[in-house]
Amino acid sequence: FSLTQRESESQDGPLTQVKTTDWERLFDAKNIKLLERKILPAYFKSKYWFGDTSRIIQSMEITNMLDLSKDDLLVKNLIVEVHFNEGLPEMYQLPVSYIANSYESLTEAVPQKGILAEVHFKESSGILVDSVYVEPFRAQLFYSLQAGATLKFGKEKLAFERGNITPDSDIE
C-alpha cells in the first residue's frame, strides 16, 4: 500500500497522454496513428527483445488487433509490423491492457517500464500497459493453454495448444 502518486514519466520523459471516450475509441484511426508514430516506437526501443536497436525505424503499423478482454480486464493483442530503413520488416505481438486508476493493486504492480501511456476516458482515467505485467492476463493465458482453449474472432481464431513434455513429467 502506498500513498505516493506514481511518477508520470517513462524512461525517455513524460508519458504520452491519450484522451478519448472509451476503450474501443482508443483504437480508432486517430489514436492508432498516435500509437504507431509515438507510443509504440518509444516503448519498443526500450525493450531488450526488440531486435537490433541500432537500426532506424522508418514506420510501425498495427496490422491486426484481437480483443482478448474478459470480464473487467480490457486487453487488445496488437500485431505490429516494424519497417526499418534497411532490411526486411519484422512482426511483433504486443498485448496491451487498460488499468483504471481505481484498481490500485493492479496499477502498483506494473513497473514503470511496462507503462505505455496515460489514458483518460470519459468515465475514468488510468494507464495503458504491456499486458505481460498484468497478473490476471498471465493467469488467463496459462488457463487457456492448460484448457486447450480456442478463441474465435470473426474469421480468425487463436488456438492455445499444449506442447509435449517429457514422459516422466506429471503436470496437472
Regions found by a protein language model. Give the residues of each.
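Regulatory N- and C-terminal appendages and interdomain linkers associated
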Residues: 1-172
